């Protein structure tokens, strides 16, 4: 899986990100990309193609990628999140009474930028996407968990990089460049892991589907991707796998949807239009509905 838009319009990877200037620590930039490694290199002038004009300001380079939000089901969804994060004073994804930033030009502190991120993750439109926040810097992690505006919630999935960087060792050019190189390496490892995990899951699912007829664990319908591939007129059934590597659960996607929706109704008293998560009927681990759907779309394309 590369960094381009995948089949069925589903991106292999897409994230929104927060950059911070290494020499000017109070300068930030918010953007989005299907490839954070390439984009960070563009921002730092290591690649000349691809724009990144707004991060060319005098004295701000190099930049570090401080935080990312990934798991978007489409480029459009990521761009909507990016725009809302950049314009928190007017976005429809934050209620007027909940706004932390109330006017243009406000919200410049790191506390406010991360608080806006949390507010967006609270909105139902983004909440069902099961987005993942990744933090690359120790001080950014401290600000996140300090939670100045008390917006932390159990449904927000945040990953802390084990090798997160501390502050640059000095203000001289050598220290700044070394810090930028270490940050780029962290982003490379993160991006590589993300693509590898999805690629390995999809490879295993395709291998199982190549065996031919498979029976839905819920309705017992027979699904045969080999047979469907030979028929130009037949649309493939959307299917669901458990992404626990030791679980062999398989069903129609619609059947698992009914299970997740029913379980969520029991927990909340409301019937969800789109469930956020649910337990695998076979191994009982918690599964992200958005992730299951994304894999299903790739497999059927």
From Swiss-Prot:
Q: What's the Enzyme Commission number for this chain?
A: 3.1.-.-
Instruction: Show the InterPro entries listed in the entry.
Output: GIY-YIG_endonuc, GIY-YIG_endonuc_sf, Slx1, SLX1_C, SLX1_endonuclease, Znf_RING/FYVE/PHD
Q: What class of enzyme is it?
A: hydrolase
Which is one Gene Ontology cellular component term of this protein? Slx1-Slx4 complex
Instruction: Please state where this protein is localized.
Output: Nucleus
Q: Which UniProt key words apply to this protein? A: DNA damage, DNA recombination, DNA repair, Endonuclease, Hydrolase, Metal-binding, Nuclease, Nucleus, Zinc, Zinc-finger
Q: Which SUPFAM superfamilies match?
A: GIY-YIG endonuclease (SSF82771)
Single Gene Ontology BP annotation:
DNA-templated DNA replication
Which cofactors does this protein require?
A: a divalent metal cation
In this entry, which stretches build a coiled coil? none
Write out the GO MF terms: 5'-flap endonuclease activity; crossover junction DNA endonuclease activity; zinc ion binding
**Occurrences of domain GIY-YIG (ranges):** 12-95
Q: Name one Pfam family in it.
A: SLX1_C
Q: Where do the zinc-finger regions (SLX1-type) map?
A: 216-283
- Assembly, per entry: Forms a heterodimer with SLX4.
Spell out the family assignment given in the record's similarity comment: Belongs to the SLX1 family.
What does the record give as the function of this protein? Catalytic subunit of the SLX1-SLX4 structure-specific endonuclease that resolves DNA secondary structures generated during DNA repair and recombination. Has endonuclease activity towards branched DNA substrates, introducing single-strand cuts in duplex DNA close to junctions with ss-DNA.
What is the official name of this protein in its record? Structure-specific endonuclease subunit SLX1
């Amino acid at each position: 899986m590369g960094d381009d838009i995948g089949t069925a319009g589903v991106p292999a990877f897409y994230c929104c990100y927060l950059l911070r200037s290494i020499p000017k620590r109070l300068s930030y930039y918010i953007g989005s990309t299907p490839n954070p490694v390439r984009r960070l290199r563009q921002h730092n002038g290591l690649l000349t193609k691809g724009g990144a004009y707004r991060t060319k300001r005098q004295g701000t380079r190099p930049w570090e990628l401080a935080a990312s939000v990934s798991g978007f089901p489409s480029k459009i969804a990521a761009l909507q999140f990016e725009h809302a994060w950049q314009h928190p004073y007017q976005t429809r994804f934050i209620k007027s009474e909940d706004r932390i930033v109330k006017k243009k030009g406000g919200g410049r502190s790191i506390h406010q930028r991360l608080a806006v991120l949390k507010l967006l993750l609270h909105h139902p439109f983004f909440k069902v996407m099961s987005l993942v926040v990744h933090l690359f810097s120790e001080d950014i992690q401290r600000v996140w968990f300090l939670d100045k505006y008390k917006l932390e919630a159990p449904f927000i999935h945040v990953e802390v990089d084990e090798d997160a960087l501390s502050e640059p060792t000095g203000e001289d050019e050598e220290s700044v460049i070394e810090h930028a190189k270490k940050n780029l390496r962290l982003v490379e490892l993160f991006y590589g892991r993300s693509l590898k995990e999805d690629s390995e899951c999809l490879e295993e699912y395709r291998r199982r589907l190549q065996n031919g007829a498979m029976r839905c664990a819920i309705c017992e319908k027979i699904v045969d991707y080999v047979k469907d591939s030979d028929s130009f007129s037949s649309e493939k059934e959307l299917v669901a796998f458990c992404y626990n590597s030791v679980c062999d659960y398989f069903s129609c996607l619609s059947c698992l949807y009914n299970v997740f929706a029913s379980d969520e109704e029991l927990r909340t008293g409301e019937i969800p239009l789109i469930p956020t998560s649910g337990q695998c009927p076979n191994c009982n681990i918690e599964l992200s509905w958005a992730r299951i759907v994304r894999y299903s779309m790739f497999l059927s394309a």
